[in-house]
C-alpha cells in the first residue's frame, strides 16, 4: 500500500509539473502571437505610410516634369503658327491628287514636264 501511495504522490507531482509546463507554454504562445500581431500591425502601418509617401513623390515628379516641359517648349510665335496652318492646308489640298497617283489611277500630279521623269504606267499599277 505504501508503494501505491508513493506512486500516487509521484504521479501527482508529475501532473503538477506537466500542468505548469502547459501553462508556461500557453503563456509563451500567447506572447508570441501577441508579438506577431503587433509586428504585423506595425508592418501594415509602415507599408501604408510608404505607399502614401510614394504617391506624393510620384505626384511631385509628375508636377516637376510638367513644369520642366512647359519651360522647355516655348509657345510658338504667331508667324510660325500661321506658317504651320498654311502648310497643313496645302498638304490637305494636294492629298487627293497624290493619292490617285500612288494608287495608279492618275498621272504624275505636278506639271507636264515632270511626267517624263516619272512615267505613268497604268498596266504596272494594276498588276
UniProtKB/Swiss-Prot annotation:
Keywords: Cell projection. One of its GO terms (cellular component) is cilium. It is found in: Cell projection, Cilium. It comes from the Eukaryota. Disulfide bonds: none annotated. InterPro entries: CEP15-like. May play a role in ciliary assembly. This is Centrosomal protein 15.
